[in-house]
Amino acid sequence: MVTLVAVVALVYLGLCGVLFLYQRNLIYFPQPRSSGSGATTLTLPADGAQVLVTPRQRGGPNALLYFGGNAEDVSYSLPGLSTAFPDYAIYLLHYRGYGGSSGKPSEAALFADALTLFDQVHADHQNIEVVGRSLGSGVAVHLASLRPVTRLVLVTPYDSLQELAAQQFPYFPVRWLLLDKFESWRYAEHVVVPTLVVAAEHDEIIPRTSSEALFKHFRTGAASFKVVAGTSHNTISESPEYMPLLKGAPRERSGG
């Protein structure tokens, strides 16, 4: 009996070790940049990596920064965003390891690169709006808590990657093992600009309850919440409501 318990304990510890060592392989799913996108790229100054940005450059005060979801080639979002924001310069960040950027993705690296991108863009554009989708929502809310963005839109966001992982692996001490926690709720209360949280009605990846939990951490009156009916995690951008929401729609639910 003692031997059996010891074997089970060793197997469990071994599985914990595998989860710890390969956790970033389970979190990030880098995609190459499609050669068919036709978009040019800029190189962002970054420590230890060549980080690419797909731009649509424009003069004037307005700019939009877009941080995409996991396994997303953000360059494909450029045509739609260009139509929706005709007078804006647009910058789409290819995370490290994604879309031709070198290096490996991590929470710290994504946060640092987003700050660098903002600082570089802010030198030419006074009014910067930020959109973060799914994985990118964590990058966007962190950025907005530290820099003077003018508006923030979070599409299918989570309150904490740590909480999502704990739900997915309930029998493992995920909170102790996870390196990249993406605790967006910690940053939400420091965001002072108008914020829109957009959830998919039938999100099978990030439960709507996670988006609602994040929403509750924003200051009272700072954020609004919108559920896009009939959409899932990956189809929300196909809704006719999607681009108007990114551009700026009337508030559905205010609070925090």
Label every model-predicted segment.
Residues E212-N234:
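Catalytic histidine neighborhood in serine/cysteine hydrolases
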Residues Q50-Q120, R133, S137-G138, A144:
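Membrane-embedded segments
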Residues D124-S134:
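Alpha/beta-hydrolase fold nucleophile elbow
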Residues I205, T231-E241:
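Catalytic histidine-centered segment of alpha/beta-hydrolase-like enzymes
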Residues V191-V192, V197-D203:
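Short beta-strand/loop motif that positions the catalytic acidic residue
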Residues L4-P45:
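An N-terminal hydrophobic leader/cap segment in hydrolases
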